[in-house]
Amino acid sequence: MLEVIHTGLNIGSKTLLHDISFIIKPGEMVAICGPNGAGKSSLIRLLCGELKPSSGEVRWEGKSLAEWNLLQLARQRALMQQHAEVGFAYTALEIILLGRHPHHLGANRPQDYQIAMAAMQEVGAVHLAEQIYSTLSGGEQARVQMARVLAQIWESSQGARLLLLDEPTAALDPLQQHRMLTIARKWADKGDVAVVAIVHDLNLAAQYADRIALLRDGRLQAIDRVESIMTPAMVEACFDLPCVLLNHPDGGTPMIAARRHPSSSMIAT
């Protein structure tokens, strides 16, 4: 279980996150949404332990992240970053094998290659295995990075696992966006994996997440079931976007559509 307890983050004199609290259980997928500059990426960096909170704490499986052995934590928690720069001519397979490093203390083992290939199969990227990562398109790189983090937490024997995704759909076309979130949903449905994903598209978030967390100006505006978050009042309060509520014709998921004629105040901002 992931617990965020009255957590704040200051960088220098600037406060990026204010008194944030929530709990996410394995088997659940939570989407973090909010306008640009809301603090979404800062929050996910706190959740993975890359940043240390200025106040409060983040706990995984009942223990503060600061108390975890880093190697053991890396076997249970993986972060797919929004931008992953690679300075060497690694193949896609070699990038994915990086996710296996916490599981061995030397050369890759046969099972590491098997898991890496299974992860590539999971994201539909087997054909990219021997291609140089830097020559791939943004969308292909995103799929390789997804395979890397899946390979990192592949084994259920490690106990509960945490999958953190920082804008996993950012570089993808619509089909690949849905494929990526379908994979995230599948892993949450395993029952022992908690998934947290930053998603800019509220309608995408509503289709795949159990709950949506709305973040604005570093403050948690709300975290609730999709039906409670996807209301015109809630969305306008977070995004300053006048909108109407629709229901998806396939399944009835609540969807948001911006009003066709924005106000002059919207244009000005």
UniProtKB/Swiss-Prot annotation:
Predominant location category: membrane
A molecular-function term among this protein's GO annotations: ATP binding
Transmembrane domains' residue ranges: none
Membrane topology classification: Peripheral membrane protein
Gene Ontology CC entries for this record: plasma membrane
The keyword Nucleotide-binding is annotated on this UniProt entry: yes
Pfam family, one: ABC_tran
Subcellular location: Cell inner membrane
The ABC transporter domain, residue ranges: 2-242
Annotated ATP binding sites: 34-41
Record's keyword terms, sorted: ATP-binding, Cell inner membrane, Cell membrane, Membrane, Nucleotide-binding, Translocase, Transport
Enzyme Commission numbers on file: 7.6.2.-
Transmembrane keyword on record: no
Quaternary organization: The complex is composed of two ATP-binding proteins (HmuV), two transmembrane proteins (HmuU) and a solute-binding protein (HmuT).
Protein family (similarity comment): Belongs to the ABC transporter superfamily. Heme (hemin) importer (TC 3.A.1.14.5) family.
UniProt function note: Part of the ABC transporter complex HmuTUV involved in hemin import. Responsible for energy coupling to the transport system.
Protein name: Hemin import ATP-binding protein HmuV
Organism phylogeny: Bacteria, Pseudomonadati, Pseudomonadota, Betaproteobacteria, Nitrosomonadales
